[in-house]
């Protein structure tokens, strides 16, 4: 009865969606270790998700979809550049140098990082005169410190892996770790930038699935062009390995397609803060699959950094939830249409209701 009346359904969807995201991270890492061009994976993934989401967007939004103008198309193209193609270029490149666990840990920094960028660009306002304001700042700082720990401190291995033992003290391996962390952080920064860009676009084109399809189309083309940076051989686009094919299909249909629909529904049902609070499930899932599937070592630095990031994330989310409630109580009506639009765009960022999820980690 609880599931039918919707009490537990969003929770189950959130847990399953985040578990799938962690599993896909581990599978993609396995495929990347095989030497495949990371942008080929991104291109196929976006292309497959486009085909999956196209009928969803057409039937669900055909009566509410506004006219797609040239201006909105150009803005969506730029949005896809930040949130899909360039983000995937750096994120997957970083994943190839590190691990699925580390990649998921960096993804958990994204809410705090987005908040900092929103402050810088004027999307967000913060008062340090209240305990809630201090909580937001504290959670943000703790998350960023956790990200710094993940980058700078690898630590000793906590597990024994014959495949990794030979390289555990390798200087080149440590350099790759630092390089990979830099690429992962760049990918997360790009995605945080996308959230601010997309918040403005959503005011003019408030159709989540249609926007996602358009972003995916642009992202597919952009990823295909970016793949030429690494190689221009046609045979690289032919997927022969069974695991690679399965990974690409799961990443496109399930992780990118079905999880996009599921996460969008959960945000509407439970709100963005509750939905974001389940993001550590991605980290736990990736760690389990990383160890069981890839047989990779788990390092002390990854564990400590991940714990710090999760603690900071929950402090941040708790403080933000209180701040959002406080803002709704104190909110005054705006006087002009321009002010209403500006406030709506700011609310999209503040509440996390960005409507579009172009690429899961």
Swiss-Prot record:
It is a multi-pass membrane protein. Residues 21-142, 194-317 form the EamA domain. SUPFAM superfamilies: Multidrug resistance efflux transporter EmrE. Keywords: Membrane, Repeat, Transmembrane, Transmembrane helix. Pfam families: EamA. One of its GO terms (cellular component) is membrane. One of its GO terms (molecular function) is transmembrane transporter activity. InterPro entries: EamA_dom (IPR000620), WAT1-related (IPR030184). It is found in: Membrane. The chain crosses the membrane at residues 8-28, 40-60, 76-96, 103-123, 132-152, 177-197, 209-229, 243-263, 273-293, 298-318. Belongs to the drug/metabolite transporter (DMT) superfamily. Plant drug/metabolite exporter (P-DME) (TC 2.A.7.4) family. This is WAT1-related protein At4g01450. It comes from Arabidopsis thaliana (Mouse-ear cress).
């Amino acid at each position: 009865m609880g599931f039918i009346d919707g009490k537990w359904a969003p929770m189950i969807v959130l847990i399953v969606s985040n578990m799938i995201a962690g599993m896909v991270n581990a599978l993609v890492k396995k495929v990347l270790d095989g030497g495949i061009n990371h942008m080929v994976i991104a291109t196929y993934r976006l292309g497959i998700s486009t085909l999956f989401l196209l009928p969803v967007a057409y039937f669900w939004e055909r009566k509410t979809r506004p006219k797609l103008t040239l201006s909105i198309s150009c803005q969506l193209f730029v949005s896809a550049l930040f949130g899909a193609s360039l983000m995937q270029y750096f994120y997957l490149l970083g994943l190839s140098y590190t691990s699925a666990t580390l990649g998921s840990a960096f993804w958990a920094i994204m809410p705090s990082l987005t908040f900092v960028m929103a402050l810088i660009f004027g999307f967000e306002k913060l008062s340090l005169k209240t305990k809630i304001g201090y909580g937001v700042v504290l959670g943000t700082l703790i998350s960023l410190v956790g990200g710094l720990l993940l980058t700078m401190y690898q630590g000793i291995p906590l597990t024994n892996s014959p495949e990794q033992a030979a390289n555990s003290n390798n200087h080149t391996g440590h350099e790759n770790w630092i390089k990979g962390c830099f690429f992962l952080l760049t990918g997360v920064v790009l995605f945080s930038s996308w959230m601010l860009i997309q918040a403005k676009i959503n005011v003019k084109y408030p159709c989540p699935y249609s926007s996602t399809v358009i972003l995916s189309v642009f992202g597919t083309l952009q990823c295909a062009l970016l793949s030429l940076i690494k190689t221009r051989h046609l045979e690289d686009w032919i997927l022969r390995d069974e695991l690679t094919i399965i990974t690409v299909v799961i990443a496109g249909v399930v992780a990118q397609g079905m999880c996009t629909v599921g996460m969008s529904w959960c945000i509407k049902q439970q709100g963005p803060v509750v939905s974001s609070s389940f993001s550590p499930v991605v980290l736990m899932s990736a760690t389990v699959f990383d160890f069981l599937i890839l047989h990779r070592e788990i390092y002390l630095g990854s564990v400590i950094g991940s714990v710090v990031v999760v603690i900071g994330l929950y402090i941040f989310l708790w403080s933000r939830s209180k701040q959002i409630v406080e803002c709704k109580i104190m909110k005054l009506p705006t006087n002009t249409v321009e002010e209403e639009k500006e406030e709506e765009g700011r609310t999209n960022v503040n509440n996390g209701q960005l409507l579009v999820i172009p690429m899961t980690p």
